[in-house]
């Protein structure tokens, strides 16, 4: 799937989060991904009831990877962070499903991978963060071998199946994002390097 269809539910939710009157033609696929990523990342950050400086720094580093020179996306991202915190969207599974609905299988996998990166920001994955990410992955229909490959890439606890690793490498390949947004190509490259793929 090379294009993402932004439906009226996504437009309504993004408008509510940002406080802006958005329309489908003005919403870049990158912004949809960034909004979903912020929701997942903020959820990981608050799941263990302690937000540490390392997690705040990781959020900023992730946004550096995901944002380009587009002032409009940058401004909408700032509004999105405030809106997601205000609405506590990370605790609303239906809202997260609505945001992630337009995303491709590859983008959903990338989203979960950024969640795992956030969960290791303070040195280890808290059990509550891990359960939150498993729940997110399940809702996004991320296949278990793919989830295990990502988790193993950040924890080095259990070796993943070679097939799972190869499938994740393919799903995070540049060709999966080239026609959507060049920033997502860069984000996938970044994540492959983090996962040593």
Language-model features: locations:
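Small-residue-enriched hydrophobic alpha-helices in membranes
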Residues: 1-43, 50-197
């Amino acid at each position: 799937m090379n294009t993402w269809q932004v439906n009226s539910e996504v437009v309504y939710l993004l408008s509510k989060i940002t406080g802006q009157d958005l329309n489908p033609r003005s919403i870049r696929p990158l912004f949809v991904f960034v909004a979903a990523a912020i929701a997942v990342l903020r959820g990981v950050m608050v799941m263990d009831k302690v937000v540490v400086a390392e997690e705040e720094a990781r959020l900023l580093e992730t946004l550096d990877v995901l944002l380009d020179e587009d002032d409009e996306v940058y401004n909408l991202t700032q509004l999105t962070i405030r809106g997601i915190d205000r609405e506590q969207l990370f605790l609303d599974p239906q809202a997260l499903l609505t945001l992630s609905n337009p995303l491709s299988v590859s983008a959903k996998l990338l989203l979960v991978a950024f969640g795992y990166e956030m969960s290791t920001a303070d040195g280890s994955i808290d059990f509550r963060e891990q359960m939150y990410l498993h729940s997110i992955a399940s809702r996004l229909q991320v296949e278990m071998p793919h989830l295990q490959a990502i988790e193993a890439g950040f924890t080095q606890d259990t070796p993943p199946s070679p097939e799972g690793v190869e499938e994740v490498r393919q799903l995070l390949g540049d060709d999966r994002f080239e026609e959507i947004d060049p920033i997502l190509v860069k984000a996938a490259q970044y994540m492959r390097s983090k996962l040593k793929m």
